[in-house]
Design a protein with these regions (language model features):
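Conserved N-terminal phosphate-binding loop of PLP-dependent enzymes in the Aspartate aminotransferase
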Residues: 1-434
Length: 434
């Protein structure tokens, strides 16, 4: 019988020492109104908690584990690297090798800087954009998350283009007011804004495939519009591919949609599950960063040899066997088509959206194109679906506004088991609609 007694006790103790008992808010399970399982180990497609429950994992550490948990080749590379020392604060050959592999996957990243997190990557990319253009204003889109730096933690009010209002206490109004938010997938709003004040904007930053309001692909022409207006007005286009990089395709969303950004931010998969992110782009722009140029960016643990080893091993496997990208996408297609078939069978309004190997099940009867669409989905039905799956060994993101992911270890048996549990969950929801 499914139970989380040990996890519940562990959570209560954790709350005494950490805010809310966690180190990232979504892990608290507050959005689904419960307590989280505390994880003890993971292997392949499976994750295990301290109550000895086993789950098929579709969170995959929020995306990084495309090779599955504890990939033997990645683990072996770490076991070999750790005895040589865990941090030097000095250049290593590994850094250059990783940069070369990243560039091979994404040629737009001509010069690359290694950092420790996606937040560092986006924060630094914005500083570079502002320093390079000599402008202060940036544009982001409602529902796109780019880390928790002050300039990006803002929300929109009413109107076409809203100058930033802080989305968290502690974010100064003066910092946020240079951030302009627009609706995702709204090309007309972008054009209108740039017609009015385009020559004052340093950059647009965008998730080319939104993943932080659930999986929301770009509408045809949207990314093209961003590229067109930024070029016309001397602003930079920054792709935040922290989530969709290596998920949308082998070369990220920029390859899938054939759009070349000025700067790209990567994380998650690029570190193979370790704290590592990168940002990079055109040589002329990136060479403005110290010590090559005047724009300052630094980090004590940037290029950490253990994290770089993990990333290098992961990218080496993906480079050696590019069929992995098709395999994980095919598995995602099979899974999502199964969800759609079952939901239709039980007359449960569901829209399943996916790009590459990332997906979200939205409990709604219309396609989700922006944050307002996502926010209008049925949260109670999501909770029913989520809890039935969790209690039957299927581990999804504990929020209706998150993406889920598939790894190379999710074989046909895992897909079949997942769909069998989904069948039960959709039937349960259907019974409430009678």
């Amino acid at each position: 019988m499914f139970q989380l007694g040990k996890s519940e006790k562990a959570f209560e103790e954790a709350k005494r020492y950490m805010p809310g008992g966690v180190n990232s808010p979504v892990r608290s399970y507050r959005s689904v109104g419960s307590n989280p399982p505390f994880i003890s180990s993971a292997s392949g497609s499976r994750i295990y908690d301290i109550d000895n429950n086993e789950y098929i994992d579709y969170v995959l550490s929020w995306g990084p584990m495309i090779l599955g948990h504890a990939n033997p080749e990645v683990i072996a590379s770490l076991q070999e690297a750790i005895p040589r020392g865990t941090s030097y604060g000095a250049p290593t050959l590994l850094e250059t090798e990783l940069a070369k592999k990243v560039q091979a996957f994404m040629p737009s990243m001509e010069v690359i800087r290694l950092v420790n997190s996606g937040t560092e990557a986006t924060m630094s990319a914005l500083r570079v954009a502002r320093g390079y253009t000599g402008r202060d204003r940036i544009v982001k889109f409602v529902g796109c998350y780019h880390g928790h730096s002050d300039a990006l933690l803002v929300k929109a009010g009413s109107g076409l283009a809203t100058f930033g209002v802080p989305d968290s206490p502690g974010v100064p109004q003066g910092v946020a007011e240079n951030t302009i938010t627009l609706p995702y997938n709204d090309s007309d709003a972008v054009r209108k804004l740039f017609d009015e004040i385009g020559d004052t904007i340093a950059a647009i930053i965008v998730e080319p495939v939104a993943g932080n309001m659930g999986c929301v692909p770009p509408e045809p022409g949207f990314l093209e519009t961003l590229r067109e207006v930024t070029k016309a007005h001397g602003a930079l286009l920054i792709f935040d591919e922290v989530m969709c990089g290596f998920r949308a395709s082998s070369g990220g969303a920029q390859k899938r949609y054939n759009i070349k950004p000025d700067l790209t931010c990567l994380g998650k998969i690029v570190g193979g599950g370790m704290p590592l992110a990168v940002f990079g782009g055109a040589r002329e722009i990136m060479n403005q960063i110290a010590p090559a140029g005047p724009i300052y960016q630094a980090g004590t643990l940037s290029g950490n040899p253990i994290a770089v080893t993990s990333g290098l091993a992961t990218l080496s496997i993906l480079q050696r066997d590019p069929t992995i990208f098709k395999q994980v996408e095919d598995a995602t297609i099979a899974l999502c088509e199964g969800f759609e078939r079952l939901a239709a069978q039980y007359n449960v309004p569901v829209v399943v959206q996916r790009v590459g190997s990332m997906f979200t099940i939205f409990f709604t009867d219309k396609p989700v194109k922006n944050f307002d669409d996502a926010a209008s989905c049925n949260e109670e039905q999501f909770k029913m679906f989520f809890y039935h799956n969790l209690s039957h060994g299927i581990y999804y993101a504990p929020s209706p506004y998150e993406s889920n992911f598939v790894s190379i270890c999710h074989k046909s048996s895992e897909i079949e088991r997942t769909l069998a549990v989904a069948d039960e969950a959709f039937k349960k929801i259907s019974d409430t609609l009678l």
